[in-house]
Amino acid sequence: MFKDITLGQYYQTDSLLHRLDPRVKIVGTLVYIISLFVVDTFAGYFVCLLFLAAMICLSNVPVGYIVRGMRAILILLLITMSFNLFLTPGEVLVRIGFLKITREGLIFSLKMAIRLSLLVIGSSLMTLTTTPNQLTDAIESLLNPLKRFRVPVHEIAMMMSIALRFIPILMEETDKIMKAQIARGADFESKNLIKKMKSLVPLLVPLFISAFRRANDLAMAMEARCYRGGVGRTKMKPLIYEGRDQAAYMLLVAYFAICVLLRFLRLPFLI
């Protein structure tokens, strides 16, 4: 399950989305996430889905590779849907004992599931098409105005980039530890939820030790290369906006405008 997480991984290939300025991709991801909370109808989510599908086509990343990240949040998705399905008041459609499924709960749970799925896939697409160095430079460039207030922009950008890239590494490490403990007789497949949670507790100690060891190795490697923060550092590949980046910004503005219109344009056939 852990190896299915695509957030934080980079998929190397040549595509239009890979060649875009990383600042455009970060801003685009933020705009896309905001748009998911702006729209509140199935028509709006369909527009978000079309936009995401177009970006996936432009990325040349296999759809199966992107969608497999959904397996990791399947339990969270089911829990979210269940809470909204049974706890939302409204017109009762089905009653099962003390539980009741309402029309409003059914619609709201479907919307939440769609929103969460699109959010995870959209966020993963940014890291799949952006290298760690590009991500760090882009975050630093976007936060650059904060330097006037003595905010350590470079260090913040570096920490965010490292944290994001450590997600798949830690998930892979967790998978290895689980396999090692299964070989020693540990049971992670129990259907009893309490037993399953207890079996995950022994994972924490080796996982924390591994995380600290990797962090120490990274710190030593950075010191060996004389890393002293962002003071006096120059860029080997400075970020420069090109024509395609400006066109991408215009596309983002048009997309967000459509989402806002769908939110405030109350048509009777939009649910």
Residue ranges: model-predicted function:
Residues 1-42, 48-57, 144, 148-151, ...:
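Transmembrane alpha-helix interface motif
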Residues 14, 37, 60-65, 96, ...:
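Membrane-helix interfacial "entry" motifs
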Residues 25, 64-74, 248:
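Alpha-helical transmembrane segments and their helix-start/interface "positive-inside/aromatic belt" motifs
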Residues 41, 45, 60-64, 88-96, ...:
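Transmembrane helix-loop junctions in multipass membrane proteins, especially transporters and channels
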Residues 51-61, 76-79:
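Alpha-helical transmembrane segments and their membrane-interface exit regions
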Residues 69-73, 77, 113, 117, ...:
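Loop-to-transmembrane-helix entry motif
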Residues 73-186:
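Juxtamembrane/interface alpha-helical elements of multi-pass membrane proteins
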